[in-house]
UniProtKB/Swiss-Prot annotation:
Monomer. It holds the Pfam family GTP_EFTU. This is Elongation factor Tu. Mg(2+) binds at T26. It comes from Sodalis glossinidius (strain morsitans). InterPro entries: EF-Tu_GTP-bd, EF-Tu_GTPase, EFTu-like_2, EFTU_2, G_TR_CS, P-loop_NTPase, Small_GTP-bd, T_Tr_GTP-bd_dom. It is an enzyme of class 3 (hydrolase). It is found in: Cytoplasm. GO terms for cellular component: cytosol. Residues 19-26 are annotated as: G1. Keywords: Cytoplasm, Elongation factor, GTP-binding, Hydrolase, Magnesium, Metal-binding, Nucleotide-binding, Protein biosynthesis. Belongs to the TRAFAC class translation factor GTPase superfamily. Classic translation factor GTPase family. EF-Tu/EF-1A subfamily. Residues 10-204 form the tr-type G domain.
Amino acid sequence: MSKEKFQRTKPHVNVGTIGHVDHGKTTLTAAITTVLAKAYGGSARAFDQIDNAPEEKARGITINTSHVEYDTPTRHYAHVDCPGHADYVKNMITGAAQMDGAILVVAATDGPMPQTREHILLGRQVGVPYIIVFMNKCDMVDDEELLELVEMEVRELLSQYDFPGDDTPVIRGSALKALEGDEAWTAKIIELAEALDSYIPEPERAIDKPFLLPIEDVFSISGRGTVVTGRVERGIVKVGEEVEIVGIKDTTKTTCTGVEMFRKLLDEGRAGENVGVLLRGTKRDDVERGQVLAKPGSIKPHTQFESEVYILSKDEGGRHTPFFKGYRPQFYFRTTDVTGTIELPEGVEMVMPGDNIKMVVNLIAPIAMDDGLRFAIREGGRTVGAGVVAKVIA
């Protein structure tokens, strides 16, 4: 029994494999589950179980993703692997599978390839905080100097996109040989697991972050004041604390005078809970859906940001035609739509359905945002794209 209890208290970390097609991402995923299951318990997953990834929908977008789990002595990992390049792009932009760290797989036989670069860039844009490199197929390269060269190229590429290339762990291995049980190579999988444990810090839990609640509804209760409802996204709000109302209009301060859940009064509302928050001295018309309630000073409203977006294909129910500069859709953040205009990168005239692209967005009203916030692009209530705030500008 004691073992079960211990399992549940292990920190939970989300990771995934990224890298160029056919460099061995799925084979590595299978090798990790197989080797770690033998070493530390858990269940092995075969290559074809992982490769045959089920379809799932995230924000109306179809993505093929495989989810596997494995344990090290100190942590529990949830790991995502995607069969196709397009699935990676969609996954990273929608945040369907948020990664605390990524394992970049680079075949020693090829070195860095176009998708290697694209996945590193995407990782930077969507806020993947840590990358570890697994140089795969090293059993097929006899020349030590060639291995050195590939490693150097990968490190330079990481540094180019503001990852610490010189300090990144690089493990040289062979996923296939490890999967076949060759001990020299299974040791490299254990080494990779140890690098995950030591290099990726334990993610901060939502409850430890500053309080934020996206406002879904506003009511006025006679004799008591104004109540806003929503699901607490992060942090804790306690009765008696000062909070800010941020977004759409000028930021205002107010005090939380009550928290209720299912008509019961509570002392506080915590991350993940659906609550009503009573606000002192706030008028019904001062607050609206689309604003957020937040710890004072923790989040600011912005109208201009750089984003990475994926435009749905026609088959996904997206647009049938491209759009051009001057396109004015709605941008759906958390609970509301705000109209905005777009600026396309230099030299890009139009964007086709199915493309992913970097664009600068200018909203007509400010929204509470940080880098990493996800949004949908909509036309008349229909989702035509998904995006992530890469960098707030103004």
